[in-house]
Amino acid sequence: MADTDRPTLLLVHGWGFDRHFFEPLVDYMSQFKCITVDLGFTGDPVMPVFDPDEKHLAVGHSMGFMWLLKHKPVQWQGLIGINAFPRFTETVGYHPAQPVRVLELMQEQYFRKPDRVTADFMSRCGNDNPLNRFDIERMAESLAWLADWDEREALAREQTPVFVLAGKSDPIVSPAMTEAGFEGVAPIQWHDGGHLLPTEYPAWCAERLIAAWDSL
């Protein structure tokens, strides 16, 4: 099938990763043309050129889902969050989520011990092979995104179908946090896995992405 005949899968990774994060998932998505935004944690940011005439399924992992809601770089036909959230930290009327103080401590410690903070976060995610080089200032800037962004209103305004894939054992985005963010807004499909579903269970994710697209 020619690229012009295939829908486009738009992928955005989360904090501490890069465009290569989705490679295990992309291997299962041959019926899509896959393009990936790179947020610049390991080098220069990469923003693909979008064709507004193409049909898009947008997929954000973790913070990448908030990035899509905030920036909406192209009109899409469906939106999927994996291990995702519309807001990362707790606030009045929104809990459970990550305590504000936890993120404040990460921000305070980051410029003094960026390697340690990054490695600790990756270990919590279940990733024992964190990036071996990264842009400290860009990573610190994106910690502020996690602290400040609140895309609940953007999610409520979303006009296209929204789907959520979540891990029952996710140590970053707990099941209760997932439900707080999406209950009554989007259907949630659960896997027993943790925070890195696209790399740990790419076939499972691919099946659900394809089913979501077919349902549009």
Report residues per predicted region.
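Conserved alpha/beta-hydrolase catalytic His-Asp/Glu region
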Residues: 109-156
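Gly/Ala-rich beta-loop-alpha elbow adjacent to hydrolase catalytic centers
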Residues: 59-68
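Catalytic histidine-centered segment of alpha/beta-hydrolase-like enzymes
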Residues: 193-207
